[in-house]
């Protein structure tokens, strides 16, 4: 592929280590009939090796210069290019009738977290996602309760899927080299949550509220949300810190509680703020 100048606003760091590319592809265990979509193909470091293994590949790319280069070097029969912002793309449209979609990508670090939640909202169409991300984010995605990396991101992602740390990727595997280490993670959406929440929006807000006082007992952060009697009813020690509770614990607390009246009012449709809390 011809030379392309990286664009800082797209968070572009292009992978160029073929050994790591091959290792990432091997972890997929590609099978005949798989429908795979690559997010952010860039210069094709993953794209071309994937096309050696597959008869056809979908890619989602926003950079028009890269799209032009990909179109010059590939036919639509082999490579379908979707010119779109991945954060707005409807991945369900790519799912075949008989099998779920598979997703892969070296994701721009500046959009990785919102993009993962965008994909999880469409998880009914996806069997698995394999991503190269900032190592710190991968450690948070795959963390366990009681560890320093366990937090809002860990809980909400693991509510929706199984998260597995696959392998480390050094900065020199990219051009230009990022200032951080990277790693590869696999996310496998649950067919249904092992611990279903009655209201996922309430669960998300409760988890966010709990971690406003990460180093204190959870009773402090959830003082207006969960009563002492409710903690006792679900068998959770209110003296534990927020990072010591599991996904199941948070679901139990969410299912037995309601947000304080002022939080409900702030998110009611008739208020001026009516958009609610969309933070993750």
UniProtKB/Swiss-Prot annotation:
It catalyses: adenosine(1518)/adenosine(1519) in 16S rRNA + 4 S-adenosyl-L-methionine = N(6)-dimethyladenosine(1518)/N(6)-dimethyladenosine(1519) in 16S rRNA + 4 S-adenosyl-L-homocysteine + 4 H(+). Pfam families: RrnaAD. GO terms for cellular component: cytosol. One of its GO terms (molecular function) is RNA binding. It is found in: Cytoplasm. Keywords: Cytoplasm, Methyltransferase, RNA-binding, rRNA processing, S-adenosyl-L-methionine, Transferase. S-adenosyl-L-methionine binds at residues 13, 15, 40, 61, 85, 106. SUPFAM superfamilies: S-adenosyl-L-methionine-dependent methyltransferases (SSF53335). Gene3D superfamilies: Ribosomal RNA adenine dimethylase-like, domain 2, Vaccinia Virus protein VP39. It is an enzyme of class 2 (transferase). It comes from the Bacteria. Its EC number is 2.1.1.182. PROSITE patterns: RRNA_A_DIMETH, SAM_RNA_A_N6_MT. Residues 258-280 are annotated as: Disordered. HAMAP family: 16SrRNA_methyltr_A. Specifically dimethylates two adjacent adenosines (A1518 and A1519) in the loop of a conserved hairpin near the 3'-end of 16S rRNA in the 30S particle. May play a critical role in biogenesis of 30S subunits. Belongs to the class I-like SAM-binding methyltransferase superfamily. rRNA adenine N(6)-methyltransferase family. RsmA subfamily. This is Ribosomal RNA small subunit methyltransferase A. It comes from Alcanivorax borkumensis (strain ATCC 700651 / DSM 11573 / NCIMB 13689 / SK2). The lineage of its organism: Bacteria, Pseudomonadati, Pseudomonadota, Gammaproteobacteria, Oceanospirillales.
């Amino acid at each position: 592929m011809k030379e392309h100048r990286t664009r800082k606003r797209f968070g572009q760091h292009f992978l160029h280590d073929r050994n790591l590319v091959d290792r990432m592809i091997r972890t997929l265990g590609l099978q005949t009939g798989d429908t795979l979509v690559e997010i952010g193909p860039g210069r094709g470091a993953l794209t071309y090796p994937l096309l050696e293994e597959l008869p056809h590949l979908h890619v989602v790319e926003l950079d028009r210069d890269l799209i032009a280069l990909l179109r010059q070097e590939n036919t639509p029969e082999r490579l379908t290019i979707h010119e779109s912002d991945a954060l707005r793309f409807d991945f369900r449209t790519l799912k075949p009738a008989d099998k779920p979609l598979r997703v892969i990508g070296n994701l721009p670090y500046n959009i990785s977290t919102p993009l993962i939640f965008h994909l999880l909202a469409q998880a009914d169409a996806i069997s698995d996602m394999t991503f190269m991300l900032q190592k710190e984010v991968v450690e948070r995605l795959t963390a366990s309760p009681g560890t320093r990396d366990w937090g809002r991101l860990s809980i909400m992602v693991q509510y929706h899927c199984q998260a597995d740390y696959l392998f480390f990727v050094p900065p020199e595997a990219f051009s230009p080299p990022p200032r951080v280490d990277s790693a590869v993670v696999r996310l496998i959406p649950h067919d249904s949550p092992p611990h279903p929440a009655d209201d996922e929006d309430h669960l998300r807000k409760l988890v966010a509220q709990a971690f406003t006082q990460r180093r204190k007992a959870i009773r402090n952060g959830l003082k207006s949300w969960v009563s002492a009697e409710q903690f006792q009813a679900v068998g959770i020690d209110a003296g534990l810190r927020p990072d010591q509770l599991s996904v199941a614990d948070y679901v139990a607390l969410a299912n037995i509680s309601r947000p304080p009246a002022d939080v409900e009012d702030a998110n009611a449709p008739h208020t001026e703020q009516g958009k609610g809390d969309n933070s993750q």
